[in-house]
């Protein structure tokens, strides 16, 4: 019986991979950009997941956003698959891939400077539609709708920027935008908990000359009315916001790149306020069970230098567990950590390296104890992960 079940799962997986590869053989009038296969040498069965997609941002202005896929069972990393599956799409994925998510049978990629959300079949990565949203940033899903943050206006540093940001509401059945809710200036990541949307407002275009030009609040939107109810004061220049297993919120501030450092903040959702400040830089993080895995990449306009850090925080006690994630010295090889994910089953840790932001970046896989398992070349500025569920 176990062999029969295993054979069925293998058959389904082969079907999924076949869909990813089938379309390259039926083009005759269009030049096809072929994907590249890389073997990691670590095939394994991960219960509940086929693998993951990795969205490479690409340097702004070059239309170099690309999409990669890693299959856990075959240990095959397929590099740059979107162009191969969609050869008739001009400029391929577009300019600056900023976020990625899966809802139902669809894969959504937020392409920031191309002002669109690319919607694909999750199994084939063939385009289904594109949704035009100006200067779009991050995406989350709830009850048949996608919610996308938007800076609304052009990409420009301006202390007098007047275009307020919004959250777009998109029907995932029709793939049409149906509503907008105004929030703060330059809203970044959003989170959804108990029928409320929490939005980290940054004001990132407005604070270059003065720290006070940045936003410092989280907008709270009621999903039923789709109206902003209130703001939660946090800190200047917010970016990330993620909920832990108890529904409380973890928010990051970029700081002002001068004297005000990046920090991680804890919002007690019941109280509706910040109750804890974690004294670590928080550029990006991933929450798995009760642990928050975070890295910081802080640049200072005073020293003109970067400071890189890694930490793990216990979301229950709100204490720093360790100020390291990588334990074998490989962190010294990583020039600019740019993305992070934790495998929810075997607890492998994935960290990307943007390098010099021009040449191809790298993807590292570490064991739960922080030792390197494998590494490979990814696309330009590898950044955003999404796991592909098998059921």
Which residues make up each language-model segment?
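Predominantly soluble domains enriched in secretory-pathway, periplasmic, or organellar proteins
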Residues: 27-391
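C-terminal motif of bacterial Sec signal peptides marking the signal peptidase cleavage site
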Residues: 22-25
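N-terminal secretory signal peptides that target proteins for export/translocation
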Residues: 1-9
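Sec-dependent signal peptide recognition
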Residues: 10-17
């Amino acid at each position: 019986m176990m062999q029969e079940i295993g054979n069925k799962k293998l058959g389904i997986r082969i079907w999924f991979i076949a869909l990813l590869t089938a379309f390259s053989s039926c083009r005759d009038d269009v030049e096809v950009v072929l994907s590249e296969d890389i073997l990691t040498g670590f095939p394994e069965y991960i219960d509940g997941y086929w693998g993951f997609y990795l969205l490479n941002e690409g340097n702004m202005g070059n239309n170099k956003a690309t999409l990669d896929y890693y299959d856990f069972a075959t240990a095959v990393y397929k590099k740059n698959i979107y162009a191969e599956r969609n050869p008739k799409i001009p400029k391929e994925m577009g300019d600056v891939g900023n976020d990625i998510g899966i809802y139902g049978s669809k894969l959504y990629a937020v392409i920031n400077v191309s002002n669109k959300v690319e919607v694909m079949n999750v199994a084939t990565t063939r385009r289904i539609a594109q949704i035009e949203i100006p200067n779009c940033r991050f995406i989350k899903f709830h009850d048949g709708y996608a919610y996308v943050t938007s800076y609304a206006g052009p990409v420009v540093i301006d202390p007098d920027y007047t275009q307020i940001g919004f959250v777009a509401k998109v029907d995932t059945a029709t793939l049409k935008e149906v509503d907008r809710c105004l929030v703060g200036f330059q809203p970044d990541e959003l989170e959804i908990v108990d029928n409320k949307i929490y939005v980290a407002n940054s004001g990132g275009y407005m604070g270059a000359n003065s720290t006070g030009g940045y936003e410092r609040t989280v907008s709270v939107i009621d999903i039923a009315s789709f109206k902003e109810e209130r703001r939660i004061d946090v800190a200047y220049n917010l970016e990330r916001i993620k909920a832990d297993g108890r529904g409380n919120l973890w928010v990051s501030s970029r700081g002002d790149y001068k004297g005000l450092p990046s920090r991680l903040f804890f919002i007690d959702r019941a109280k509706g306020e910040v109750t804890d400040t974690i004294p670590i830089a928080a550029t990006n993080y991933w929450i798995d069970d009760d642990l928050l895995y975070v890295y910081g990449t802080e640049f200072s306009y005073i020293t003109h230098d970067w400071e890189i850090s890694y930490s793990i925080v216990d979301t229950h006690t709100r204490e720093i567990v360790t100020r390291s994630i990588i334990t074998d010295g490989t962190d010294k090889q990583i020039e600019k950590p740019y993305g992070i994910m934790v495998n929810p089953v075997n607890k492998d840790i994935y960290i990307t390296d943007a390098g010099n932001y021009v040449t191809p970046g790298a993807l590292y896989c570490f064991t739960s104890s922080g030792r390197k398992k494998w590494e490979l070349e990814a696309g330009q500025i590898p950044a955003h992960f999404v796991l592909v569920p098998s059921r």
